[in-house]
Structure formats: C-alpha cells, structure tokens
Swiss-Prot record:
InterPro entries in the cross-refs: GAF-like_dom_sf, HrcA, HrcA_C, WH-like_DNA-bd_sf, WH_DNA-bd_sf, WHTH_transcript_rep_HrcA_IDD
Record-level Gene Ontology MF annotations: DNA binding
Domain of life, per lineage: Bacteria
GO BP term, pick one: negative regulation of DNA-templated transcription
Family stated for the protein in its record: Belongs to the HrcA family.
Protein name: Heat-inducible transcription repressor HrcA
Lineage, top ranks: Bacteria, Bacillati, Actinomycetota, Actinomycetes, Mycobacteriales
Length: 341
C-alpha cells in the first residue's frame, strides 16, 4: 500500500468513526478538527473525492458531507487489527453473571441479555440443535395411569419433554422396563442415528408393554428425530428502535426476521467455528430482511466443538471493533461455563 493509499484509508477510517459516533454526514472541515491527519483541507477534499469515486463513501446531498457505504464499512472491518480488549472488571462481570445460570438454557439466556447490554444491539443465541446432540438419558415419568412424560436429556445439557397418551395403564414395574429399554436403545446415540433403533425397539419390546413402547417411540421419532425443534433466545430488540431516520424504515423487516426466527436460525446454523467472528454487512446478508443491518456472529461450545451460534443484529453504523470484541468474549465465557472451568 502506497503512502497515498494509506492516507486515504486513514481518511476513510476517520469518516467511518465519526459517522458511527454521530450518524451525521462528515465533512472535510470536521475531519481536520477532530483527527490529526497532518494534511491540508484541499488534500482531504481530494481524498474524499477519490474515495467517493471508488464507492467507499457517498454524498447524499449536494451541500452535505459524506457517509460510508457498505463497501466502505467492509474495508474498515477487514482492516481492523486492534480489537478493543475488555477491561478486567468487564471480564469478571461477564463470568460472574454467566456462572449464576442454573442450567444450559439459563446460561444462554443470560448470555444474550448481557450481550445486548454490552453492545446496545439486539442479541440472539441458538440453543444447541438436537440433530447433533447425543442422548445422555431418557426419563419416563407416569403423569397419570394413561399418560407418560418423556424427558430427554442430551450431552449439550438440553432438556426436551413430550407427553405420551396410552391405550392401557402401565404398572410401575412396566414403566421401569420401558425406561431401561429406551435408554439401552438411545444411550450415546445422536438423535438422527437413533431413529432405526427406536423403530426396531417398538417391534421387539415385550408383549405387555409393546403398545406403550410403540407410542413412546413414535413420539420420539416424529417430534425429536424427524422434526428437531431448533430455537433461539432473543434480547434487546428494543435497541433497534434507535436506528437513524435513514434506516428506521427497514426496522419492521429486521424485527420480523428476529421474531419469526427462521432467517436467523438458518444464519446461525452455518456458524461452526469457535474462533472466527463473522461480520455480514447490509447486502452481504443473503436474506432480504437483514440487508439493511449488520449481523455479527460466532460459535459457542466446549472442548473444541460448536454447540450453536450467537451474535448481534444492529445498524451498519455500529461500533465494529467493540462489538466484535464483546461477541467473541461472551462466546468464550459461555464455553468456559459450559465446560465447568
């Protein structure tokens, strides 16, 4: 990169920083006043003209300054080398808050609450998918003579419950046999790999519990194996209401994408790397609902394996360095808590 190119990048960086702080078009005079660029106003104006020609900034009105384009934000983000570190107090607060979680879902709920507060954006986390989870235990609880509760516990800490209606009541000993057979068939298997075992078990169970076993297996296969219920936890969607006038028109589409979850589930399901933070700016998002927003995501998990994705959704003029740092930190601390460190 030549000296001229370096200077122009510094001008772009200053424009992005000022626009993020104010959401107001940035002019050459304010750049010289706020930043030590050590060049003349004529040079700044020339650099801004070149940056505009190259598509990194745009002048929205003839009498106004410039604002960054999505291409300008992308160059800015790709050039970030010094991610803002969290203070010791922030790190202790994050870990202490997450360690107060009573189970996996509570830890994840706390993580998005914390992330939305730290970044002032909407935060989202994907609960571990059942598709890759392994069964640790299947509890069978009689709710009434004609109804059972199946409680499935996976190695990710996720707990799912389903009711099973019976044709005939089961004795306590029969419930115990049914429980043991289910755990024998499901133990340490992924739910996708358990389907064949459950179908075989339904056919080979002892005659006196075969109908009950068939009903239990049907419920597990139909609702947990064939149609695993991936879910999201959201926090801080109200933060999006502070969007600038230029982007507030797209707010309903962004909120709809968050609330209906399908778009975000698809995006987070592709997050498999624990060490990489991904930044999708505006039109880089595949789904039209998010093309006016920036989405920053990473994976969380333990022992080198990702259990799901988490991240934030906000305007394209967000504090990229600080937000990337906080998304990464919260994900790492979630992993530490899940690993019991």
């Amino acid at each position: 990169m030549s000296a001229t190119e370096k200077r122009r990048y510094e001008v772009l960086r200053a424009i992005v920083a000022d626009y993020i702080a104010s959401q107001e078009p940035v002019g050459s005079k304010s750049l010289l006043e706020r930043h030590k660029l050590n060049v003349s106003s004529a040079t700044i104006r020339n650099d801004m003209s070149v940056l505009e020609s190259d598509g990194f900034i745009v002048q929205e009105h003839a009498s106004s300054g410039r604002v960054p384009t999505e291409r300008g934000y992308r160059l800015f983000v790709d050039s970030i080398h010094d991610i803002k570190p969290l203070s010791l107090a922030e790190r202790r607060a994050i870990l202490g808050f997450l360690e107060g979680g009573v189970d996996l879902e509570d830890v994840l709920r706390r993580s998005v609450q914390l992330l939305s507060q730290l970044t002032h954006q909407a935060a989202v986390v994907q609960l571990p998918t059942l598709k890759t989870a392994r069964v640790k235990h299947c509890e069978v609880v009689p709710l009434s003579p004609m109804r059972l509760l199946l409680v499935l516990i996976t190695d990710t800490g996720r707990v799912d419950q389903r009711n099973v209606e019976l044709e005939e009541p089961l004795a306590a000993e029969e419930v115990n046999v049914l429980r043991d057979l289910l755990n024998g068939a499901l133990g340490e298997k992924t739910l996708t790999a358990a389907s064949d075992a459950l179908e075989e078990l339904a056919q080979q169970a002892p005659t006196d519990i075969r109908d009950a076993m068939r009903r239990c297996c049907d419920v597990l296969v139909n609702t947990l194996v064939d149609q695993p219920s991936d879910r999201l936890i959201l926090a801080g969607t109200s933060n999006l209401t502070r969007l600038s006038r230029e982007t507030s028109a797209s707010l309903p589409m962004v909120l709809e994408a968050l609330e209906e979850q399908v778009v975000m589930l698809k995006l987070l399901s592709n997050v498999t790397d624990l060490d990489q933070v991904r930044v999708h700016i505006g039109g880089e998002n595949e789904d039209i609902e998010l093309r006016s927003a920036t989405v920053i995501t990473t994976g969380y998990g333990s022992q080198g394996s990702a259990l799901g994705g988490l991240g934030v959704v906000g305007p394209t003029y967000m504090d990229y360095s600080g937000t990337i740092s906080k998304v990464s930190a919260v994900a790492k601390y979630v992993g530490r808590v899940l690993a019991g460190e």
